[in-house]
Structures are given as C-alpha cells and as structure tokens.
C-alpha cells in the first residue's frame, strides 16, 4: 500500500457523506462559561469546563493547514490548530508497515476534524520523521519536532521511546506509543507521558498459552519462546513463562537475542534439535515467515502462537508460498483489538474513512494506527475541558482520565498503574480482507486473571 501522501487529492464531499452516514456531523452547542479549576499537581487533572483555554507550544489560534505533505486534513478554517508529531520508521525493519500506520493515524484526525474537532481546535499531524527503528535516530527525530508539536501522535518502538523519555519528561511531551510494553501502564516507567492502548505483550503471552491449552486439540507439554530482547520479546516471554509455571508446562528453550542479532538459522535449529509442542514467536513479520518456512522444510509444524507484531496479512495473500502453512490450523495470532471487519461503531467509522480515502486494504496495521489515536483524543479533550492545552496541561489530563474508543477497546482509566489484560486471538485466513478470523475477543485466561497487575510491569 502506498503512503497516504502519495494517494493524491481526496474527494472531500465523499468523505463528508460517508462520515455523515456513520453518524458524524458537527452540531452547535451552547456552553455556560465557568471559572477554570485550579490544578496543583500532575496527578490532579482539570475536569471542569473552562472559560478560556491556555495554550503553548504546538497550539495556535491560526487554522491548521488544509493539507500536510499533500494529504488533506479536513481542518476547520474557523478553528485553531493542535499540531502532533510523528516518529515513524520509513527505512528500518518496519518500513513496510509504516505507510499503513501513518495512513490510519492521519485518517483518524481527518475524521475527528470533520466531526467537530477538539473544542475550538482542529488537529493535524506534521510531516513524519524517519527513525529507522534506531534509538539514536529516534532522538534526532524527536529533536527535529520538539519545538513544533503539542504531543506525539506516534513514537514507534519500545526501546526507542524509552530512549527519549528523559527529553519527553523535560518537555512535558505526551505521546501515543506504537508498542504494547507493559511498562507504559505504570508511572514508575513512563512518568505519565505515554498514552497506552490495548493489552500488553505480557498479558498476550499469558493468554496465548492458556487459550491454546484450552482450545486446541493438542496436548501442550513443552514450549519454546523466541523474540527480541529489550523489545517486545522480553515482555512477551515473561508473560508466557508465568502462564507456563501456573499450568505446569515446560519451557524447553528461549531464544531472545537483541533485535539486530536475531538469527533465523539459530531459531530454526532450536526447533529441530529440541522439538516442542508449541512455540511462541515475538519477532518481525520477515523473521516470522523465515522461521515458519524453515521449520516446515524440516518437517516441523508445531502450534505457533504469534505475538501481534509477528503477523502480516500478506502471509495469507494469494501467491504467497507459505499461505497453506499459515492457514493450516497450526498458526494463530494475538492482538490487542479485533480485526478490521469487527462489528463496533469504531470499526465502522474506520472502514468508512478508509474507503472514502480510496483504500482497499484491511491490514491490521491500519487498525493499529487508528486505534492508537483514540486515547490521545480523550486526553486532548480532557485538556481542553480543563482549560489548559499547554504541554503541562495535556500531561495533567493524561494522569487520570477515562478514555473510550467507540467500542474498539474497553473503556480505560489512564494513570491507574495497572496494565490491561484482555486479548484478541485469531486464525490466519486469506478469505477475509484482514487476513484474520477472530476466534476469541477480550479473552482473559487463568494466568492473566490471577496475575497481580498492580505490582508493576512484567519486564
């Protein structure tokens, strides 16, 4: 799929009509002015409707541009503008999925702008900056945008976001992550700056094992774990090991090298020399296809419970050599949200927006991009309600606020110091646009249910 900026001019009337059909539309309302509530600490967000809104870096009284990088914004030229930053991977290991993530995020704010915006403001994402999935380049990209934005629409990667957290702290810069590290749910780690969404890798790992044991016609006694150390692999592995201990399952091997040191041959070698009933990969899509294919060539087809970043709907596209393997009933994928076709108001709005933009993809990475913005939207709305759209005000709003997503995810209280534990589990299926048939939604197995989520992150 091409980046949104290369899609050309979008027909605004079509988008407006489709959004109206989904219930969108701007309505006028009268708000009684009240005195703003005084906020003393970062843990006490403003919750009153203020007479005026204090603004700072990245917020202007001037309207948003009509387009950014050739992409229409649907901004209201009678309103001010909230600018968001984007730290994406255009040239690194996730370059192939970066366009879908960006497309969905820009589409999300187009929808928000076309249905009333955030108070007296429209919202736009500035041109994305390439991080190459490298922490140092991530910092350089952050520095390139830090004086121009009120918050980050995306900071892709767990180690990368951790690497810039000190700078975000100095700037009171709140951001939506494109990762599901359990630490994002705890102020001891994220300092109240990362607006998390969806279940953590750790919970998905627990639920993956428990669901497989309860639902599949395989007696799972031994398992293997592979992933990227220091990235999502560690969080995922710790969840699986906790569930394995609870269930009396033997972890025969773990292969968790740093991201750039992952060796497909070594991973396949472990599967050959130490066969297991099931393995749990938390790698990138490229490594996933190579590992699964390599094991298959050796006559091995154990159950595979893939972490969300491991799966790509391209695995079940017509013409892909491993399509039969991924659809064989031995491969399953985890997610923090239901796939593209799900029946929720949020999914319907997303589909309508993507279709109006001329997109025919149902990629899970579109869902990832879209879902990542809901909680940030809730934070900005709370900041406006509190009368403070400075970065400090946005940070206060993120410290303790209920956020919802029109049914895409469960309502969540940010700042609760407790990670979400509900997972979605699917089966690769090329007959469906998203490439996934949903088998279980908001699933919580016995391990995740018994785990002390108030005790801090899993890794």
Protein language model regions, located:
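Beta-alpha junction/loop-to-helix N-cap segments that form part of ligand/metal-binding clefts
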Residues: 69, 96-103, 115-188, 197, ...
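C-terminal motif of bacterial Sec signal peptides marking the signal peptidase cleavage site
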Residues: 18-21
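Extracytoplasmic ligand/sensor domains, especially the bilobed periplasmic-binding protein
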Residues: 69-70, 149-255, 303-328
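Extracellular/periplasmic ligand-binding modules, especially the Venus flytrap/periplasmic-binding
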Residues: 229, 237-241, 285, 290, ...
């Amino acid at each position: 799929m091409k980046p949104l900026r290369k899609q050309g001019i979008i027909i605004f009337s079509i988008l407006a009509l489709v959004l109206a059909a989904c219930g969108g539309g701007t309505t006028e309302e009268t708000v009684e002015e009240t005195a703003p509530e005084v906020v003393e600490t970062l843990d006490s967000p403003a919750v009153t409707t203020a007479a005026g809104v204090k603004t700072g870096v990245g917020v202007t009284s001037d309207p948003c541009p009509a387009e950014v990088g050739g992409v229409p914004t649907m901004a209201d030229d009678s309103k001010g503008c909230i600018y968001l930053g984007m730290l994406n991977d255009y040239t690194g290991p996730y370059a192939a999925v970066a366009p879908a993530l960006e497309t969905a995020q820009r589409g999300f704010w187009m929808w928000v702008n076309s249905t009333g915006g955030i108070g007296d403001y429209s919202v736009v994402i500035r041109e994305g900056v390439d991080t190459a999935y490298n922490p140092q380049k991530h910092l350089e990209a952050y520095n390139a945008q830090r004086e121009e934005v009120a918050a980050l629409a995306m900071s892709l990667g767990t180690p990368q976001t951790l690497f810039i957290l000190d700078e975000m702290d100095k700037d009171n810069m709140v951001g939506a992550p494109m990762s599901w590290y359990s630490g994002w749910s705890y102020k001891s780690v994220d300092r109240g700056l990362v607006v998390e969404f969806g279940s953590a890798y750790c919970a998905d790992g627990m639920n993956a094992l428990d669901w497989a044991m309860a639902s599949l016609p395989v007696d799972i006694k031994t398992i293997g774990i592979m992933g990227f150390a220091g990235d999502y692999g560690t969080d995922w592995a710790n969840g699986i090991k906790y569930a394995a201990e609870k269930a009396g399952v033997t972890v025969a091997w773990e292969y968790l090298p740093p991201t750039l040191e992952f060796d497909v041959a070594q991973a396949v070698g472990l599967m050959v020399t130490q066969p297991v009933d099931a393995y749990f990969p938390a790698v990138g899509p490229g490594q996933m296809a190579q590992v699964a294919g390599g094991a298959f060539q050796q006559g091995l087809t154990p159950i595979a419970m893939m972490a969300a970043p491991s799966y790509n709907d391209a695995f079940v596209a017509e013409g892909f050599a491993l399509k039969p393997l991924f659809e064989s009933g031995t491969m399953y994928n985890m997610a923090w949200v239901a796939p593209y076709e799900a029946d929720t108001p949020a999914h319907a709005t997303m589909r309508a927006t993507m279709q109006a933009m001329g997109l025919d993809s149902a990629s899970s990475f579109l869902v990832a991009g879209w879902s990542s913005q809901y909680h940030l939207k809730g934070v900005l709305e709370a900041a406006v309600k509190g009368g403070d759209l400075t970065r400090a005000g946005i940070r206060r709003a993120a410290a303790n606020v209920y956020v919802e997503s029109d049914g895409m995810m469960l309502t969540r209280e940010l700042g609760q110091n407790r990670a979400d534990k509900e997972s979605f589990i699917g089966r690769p299926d090329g007959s469906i646009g998203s490439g996934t048939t949903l088998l279980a939604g908001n699933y919580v197995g016995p391990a995740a249910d018994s785990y002390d989520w108030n005790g801090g992150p899993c890794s």
